[in-house]
């Protein structure tokens, strides 16, 4: 996430290098690996959640030098040895301390239970405990935790009090004023003109806070809601709570679309004011560190600097009835159409209404957009260049809903889906699954339509499968060169959601083609996000034994536990490793609770290949959690847990 807050501070006078000298006396810091006198000579990194019985399973030994005669033993919960083997060949060095990473093949371990790995020989090390369990059991809990994160993100009156002691918030959103598009300077740091009211009042209360802040975006909410609905359609593993949370997201999107005036609203709240430090006449959401209900308690009048923090502005995608940026039109239409598919059997009346809204939104798509798509204000919060994938997604889901409801427009929508798929394949904005690219979801569902011999489409099922393969080949090529087999780029933002996106795409590819070639790659990507990485941390809060305790998230910091136990932001997915050089400056507010309580960064000893990780409340670069991050992870876990996702023999 690139929503930079004001008030940055340095880590220490000596930066990251200085923190490394201090961490070896810190035994209570998260991820410290019980460092006492210096870095351990070797560590074992493993997926701390675990593996399904039939998956390929790898752990990693990271040591100060390659070892050729080391062995490993796997022990069960009673300490009995159940598996042994030799340490594999080195996959490469990591940093100046750890010059070798070697694989430990655990694939023969298939009996459900709790296990740990011990390495003996020239170096010794022991892994955290991990589990072997059926896919539905293993990933079902992770899905439920992801849903809990969304419960903690709720805004408005319908909050979940057991999630971080949440209280109703931003109730003034029930009577919100609509403003014209805000004007920012060239660097998108400050407003250059007062906001101009153009409409309202309208009710935009509810929904989810976008990340660790309190802004709400149609761009991210539609992606997250569509992902939850896709997951709900895929497997019952998420249960009633997943369905309820998906409906919560859809209900807010319904408020953001005025079907009568044909107006799509895209944002609630102001992310940047008229100064970069919050000292001006117009202050923004990012200028204070507080609980969301504190905004409701503000006593303000028009013209007060904090007026727009309580009485939050609403911005439109376009004036009423005018063409809408196609990325938004396609994605929001897809979300309503997914809901229509789920409602078709039990609530056909509501399903027809949802499909009509999808069709109305889709019909307003501006298919000759300018250089900048509408995502957020300022645009730099969520830059995006791809839109043909969104149009394919919208048409595909409308066609599937049309099939379920026997709608006469189904063939036309199928044709449009094929058209936009072809345009996407010919574009120069090809990406992989995540907030900025939904082609993998669109391709997988369009392939289902083509399986039904849909006439008149401009693409073939094989072309769609080839593009899924293209996305996976990009990641698997990187993984083949990475010591921990990471397919994501961990020197830039969104490394963890990117890894989850690759894992989900591999599952979709298997479903479309029946080809299990990328199954092991998918498992490796999930393993990396859950602890089988250089830092030995899971990047899903509450998953595994070591995970972020100090996310940059205001309710988690101000109302939650800071030691990883009790009331935490369970299920939230963080950005994960980023370029180490980006961690020199952290966010700071006087009202932040200090986290961690000890000085230094115990993870710095494990930085390498340009990547760094820090668990610090001010480290938005690595531990800010976000709705879209978590939605992508939930989608990946769902596809892994689904009964139709056949486990393959690791041999």
PLM segments and residue spans:
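Carboxylate/His-rich catalytic cores and anion/metal-binding grooves
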Residues: 242-263, 267-270
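N-terminal export and membrane-targeting signals
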Residues: 1-15
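Short beta-strand edge segments in extracellular beta-sheet folds
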Residues: 130-135
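Short, compositionally biased P/S/T/A/G/V-rich stretches that sit at domain boundaries
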Residues: 38-49
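Short coil/linker segments at helix-helix boundaries
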Residues: 230-248, 270-274, 312-320, 338-354
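Aromatic (Trp/Tyr) and acidic
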Residues: 48-123, 136, 146-222, 230-231, ...
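Aromatic-lined, polymer-binding surfaces characteristic
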Residues: 329, 333-343, 351-402, 424, ...
């Amino acid at each position: 996430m690139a929503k930079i807050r004001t008030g940055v501070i340095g880590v220490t006078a000596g930066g990251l290098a200085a923190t490394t000298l201090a961490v070896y006396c810190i035994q209570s810091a998260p991820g410290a690996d019980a460092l006492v006198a210096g870095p351990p000579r070797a560590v074992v990194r493993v997926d701390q959640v675990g593996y399904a019985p039939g998956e390929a399973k790898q752990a990693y030994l990271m040591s100060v030098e390659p070892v050729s005669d080391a062995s490993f033993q796997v022990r069960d919960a009673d300490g009995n040895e159940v598996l042994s083997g030799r340490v594999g060949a080195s996959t490469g060095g990591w940093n100046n301390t750890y010059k070798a990473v070697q694989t430990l093949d655990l694939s023969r371990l298939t009996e459900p239970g709790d296990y740990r790995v011990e390495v003996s020989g020239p170096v010794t090390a022991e892994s955290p405990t991990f589990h072997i369990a059926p896919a539905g059991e293993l990933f079902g809990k992770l899905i439920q935790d992801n849903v809990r994160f969304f419960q903690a993100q709720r805004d408005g009156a319908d909050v979940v009090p057991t999630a971080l002691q949440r209280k109703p918030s931003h109730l003034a959103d029930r009577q919100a004023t609509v403003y014209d598009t805000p004007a920012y300077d060239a660097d998108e740091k400050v407003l250059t003109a007062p906001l101009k009211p153009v409409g309202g009042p309208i009710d935009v209360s509810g929904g989810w806070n976008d990340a660790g802040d309190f802004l709400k975006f149609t761009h991210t909410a539609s992606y997250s809601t569509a992902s939850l609905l896709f997951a709900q359609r895929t497997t019952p593993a998420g249960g009633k709570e997943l369905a309820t949370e998906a409906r919560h997201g859809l209900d807010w999107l319904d408020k953001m679309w005025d079907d009568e005036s044909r107006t799509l609203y895209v944002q609630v709240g102001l992310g940047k004011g008229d100064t970069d430090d919050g000292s001006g006449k117009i202050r923004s959401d990012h200028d204070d560190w507080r609980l969301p209900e504190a905004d409701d308690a503000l006593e303000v009048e028009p013209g007060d600097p904090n007026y727009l923090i309580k009485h939050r502005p609403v911005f439109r995608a376009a004036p009423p009835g005018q063409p809408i940026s196609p990325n938004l039109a396609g994605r929001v239409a897809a979300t309503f159409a997914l809901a229509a598919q789920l409602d078709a059997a039990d609530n056909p009346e509501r399903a027809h209404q949802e499909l009509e809204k999808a069709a109305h939104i889709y019909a307003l798509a501006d298919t000759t957009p300018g250089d900048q798509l509408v995502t957020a204000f300022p645009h730099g919060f969520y830059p995006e260049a791809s839109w043909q994938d969104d149009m394919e997604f919208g048409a595909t889901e409308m066609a599937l809903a049309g099939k379920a409801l026997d709608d006469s427009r189904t063939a036309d929508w199928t044709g449009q889906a094929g058209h936009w798929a072809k345009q996407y394949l010919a574009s120069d904005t090809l990406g992989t699954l995540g907030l900025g690219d939904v082609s993998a979801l669109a391709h997988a569902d369009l392939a289902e339509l083509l399986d039904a011999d849909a006439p008149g489409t401009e693409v073939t099922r094989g072309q769609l499968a080839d593009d899924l393969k293209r996305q996976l080949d990009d990641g698997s090529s990187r993984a083949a060169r990475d010591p921990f087999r990471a397919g994501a780029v961990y020197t830039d933002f969104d490394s963890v959601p990117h890894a989850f996106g690759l894992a989900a795409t591999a599952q979709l590819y298997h479903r479309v083609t029946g080809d299990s070639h990328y199954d092991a790659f998918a498992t490796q990507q999930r393993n990396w996000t859950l602890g089988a990485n250089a830092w030995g941390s899971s990047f899903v809060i509450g998953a595994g034994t070591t995970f972020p305790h100090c996310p940059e998230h205001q309710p988690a910091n101000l109302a939650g536990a800071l030691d990883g136990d009790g009331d935490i932001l369970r299920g939230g997915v963080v950005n994960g490793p980023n370029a180490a050089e980006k961690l020199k400056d952290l966010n700071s507010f006087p009202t932040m609770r200090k986290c961690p309580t000890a000085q230094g960064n115990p993870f710095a000893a494990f930085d390498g290949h340009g990547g760094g990780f820090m668990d610090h409340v001010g480290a938005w670069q690595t531990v800010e959690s976000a709705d879209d991050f978590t939605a992508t992870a939930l989608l990946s876990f769902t596809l892994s847990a689904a009964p139709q996702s056949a486990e393959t023999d690791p041999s």
